[in-house]
């Protein structure tokens, strides 16, 4: 599985005019399931997303995870948005191939599992809508962006 995480001051996702999810300071994670991914891969990726130290401590060093973004135990928001295009094969030609992405039904199942597990482990979780045409707005903080990828 893949997650492109961005440290944000705030972010929201809309389907049409309806806001489906929004957060204040925290992480926006664009999430993609690849062919052959499993729940174990999702769990491994979630642990990495929640534990990745991208927030600055008192010394200004990136040393704090989203669960403790201020060093005093305050959790930041986690906005999860499905994005199958992260699995694109761009090695040949000028048109991406999405063969590496999980089929839609499997991608939705794994994304839903990822969201469910995130809600069990983190207090502030918002989401987009799987398969919808979404508009994502964010204010990058840094910017700080990381590509995380796991295999089961």
UniProtKB/Swiss-Prot annotation:
Keywords for this protein: Cytoplasm, Hydrolase, RNA-binding, tRNA-binding
One of the record's GO molecular function terms: tRNA binding
Catalytic reaction annotation: glycyl-tRNA(Ala) + H2O = tRNA(Ala) + glycine + H(+); a D-aminoacyl-tRNA + H2O = a tRNA + a D-alpha-amino acid + H(+)
Keyword Hydrolase: yes
Location of the motif Gly-cisPro motif, important for rejection of L-amino acids: 142-143
Top enzyme class: hydrolase
Gene Ontology BP terms: D-amino acid catabolic process
Stored Pfam families: Tyr_Deacylase (PF02580)
Location within or outside the cell: Cytoplasm
Chief subcellular location: cytoplasm
One term under GO cellular component: cytoplasm
InterPro entries associated with the record: Daa-tRNA_deacyls_DTD, DTD-like_sf
TM regions (residue ranges): none
E.C. numbers: 3.1.1.96
Subunit field text: Homodimer.
Domain comment (free text): A Gly-cisPro motif from one monomer fits into the active site of the other monomer to allow specific chiral rejection of L-amino acids.
Family (UniProt): Belongs to the DTD family.
Function: An aminoacyl-tRNA editing enzyme that deacylates mischarged D-aminoacyl-tRNAs. Also deacylates mischarged glycyl-tRNA(Ala), protecting cells against glycine mischarging by AlaRS. Acts via tRNA-based rather than protein-based catalysis; rejects L-amino acids rather than detecting D-amino acids in the active site. By recycling D-aminoacyl-tRNA to D-amino acids and free tRNA molecules, this enzyme counteracts the toxicity associated with the formation of D-aminoacyl-tRNA entities in vivo and helps enforce protein L-homochirality.
Name the record gives this protein: D-aminoacyl-tRNA deacylase
Gene: dtd
